[in-house]
A protein has these predicted regions:
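Classical Sec-dependent N-terminal signal peptides that target proteins to the secretory pathway
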Residues: 10-13
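Pocket-lining segment of extracytoplasmic ligand-binding domains
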Residues: 102-104, 173-174, 178-267
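Ligand-binding clefts/hinges and TM-proximal coupling segments of bilobed small-molecule sensing domains
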Residues: 22-29, 153-173, 246-280
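An extracytoplasmic/periplasmic, membrane-proximal ligand-sensing/linker region
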Residues: 25-34, 38-46, 193, 262-305
Length: 305
């Protein structure tokens, strides 16, 4: 009797293990199918590289409020702390578009990445010094360190500031790609000055760090949204981009109607600043999609690092 019981137990165990094995294989197959489908959807989506700055606000609002989805276009924002990471994604063709500046775009062109500008943006930058460094004017940057992102508008603006100051000693340009790292270096007294966009510039000013130069005073409009040229030549992609720009314009209207502070929670979430910074932001006006000025394109193209 015990012999038969032992045999029955063995058979049941084998059957159980076999069913477990089948279940595990089924789960593996299902996971693979889900991964393949997710990859297919991601490949078909319109992917745009962004950074945590105010020129990206219309995109962040549209994503957060599902406005792209409601317009029937799958837009996926690839969020990075630096333009360089977005460049890498664009270079590997894992993104169709990027929020960038005209200097950076020219650098990408030299690397063989042809871009089409679909709109300019309201991006701006300020050269802000560390109050501990006691740099209150440009000529005091002599023998100081300025944090910039290489091959970008920040490097061009730093060069403009330094050249105009005619300092007695060399000014050292320190390459810090991540915009929030540049901000932290100012706040932690680790750098003498930095080129910062909004909202990082506002946060730096709140800590009494002086502004030495503002790109808005130079009549420079260097911010752009661009897509790879080959993407713009694809019929399906062109339709996606058309819908993207329609949503962009509608979002711009909403921002101008309600003001940027109305979207404080989204600014906090996507840009990593507190409400104190949000409430201190300057008044900003966003514009509908419009091509960048030829003078700004030429200025970006002329810059040689």
């Amino acid at each position: 009797m015990r012999k038969y019981q032992h045999l029955l137990f063995s058979l049941l165990s084998i059957a159980f293990l076999a069913s477990c094995g089948k279940s595990y294989k089924d789960q593996q197959r299902l996971n693979r199918e889900q991964q393949i489908e997710a990859a297919r959807q991601d490949s078909a989506a319109l992917k745009i590289a962004t950074v945590p700055t105010m020129d990206c606000l219309p995109l962040f609002i549209a994503a957060e409020d599902s406005l792209f989805q409601k317009a029937g276009v799958d837009v996926r924002l690839k969020r990075f702390g630096s333009q360089t990471d977005g460049d890498t994604l664009l270079r590997s063709k894992n993104a169709e578009g990027i929020v960038t500046d005209l200097v950076k775009a020219e650098h990408l062109r030299h690397q063989g990445i042809a871009l089409k500008f679909v709109t300019s943006t309201n991006a701006s930058w300020q050269l802000i010094s560390n109050r501990i460094a006691r740099v209150a004017e440009l000529k005091q940057l002599s023998d100081k360190m300025v944090a910039i992102a290489p091959y970008s508008a920040t490097q061009m603006l730093a060069d403009m500031a330094i050249d105009s100051a005619r300092t007695k000693e060399k000014v050292y340009r320190i390459e810090i790609n991540d915009v929030n790292v540049r901000l932290k270096m100012i706040l932690n007294n680790e750098i003498d000055a930095a080129i910062l966009p909004e909202p990082q510039a506002t946060q730096a000013r709140l800590f009494q760090n002086p502004v030495l130069m503002d790109s808005r005073d130079k009549n420079l409009h260097l911010g752009v949204i661009a897509f790879r040229q080959e993407v713009m030549e694809n019929k399906d992609r062109k339709q996606q981009i058309k819908k993207f720009l329609q949503v962009y314009d509608a979002t711009v209207d909403s921002i101008n109607k309600h003001g940027v502070k109305h979207y404080g929670k989204i600014i906090r979430k996507y840009m990593g600043v507190d409400m104190h910074t949000v409430n201190a932001l300057p008044t900003m006006t966003y514009h509908h999609t419009t091509s960048p000025r030829q003078r700004d394109i030429a200025r970006g193209a002329r810059f040689t690092p």
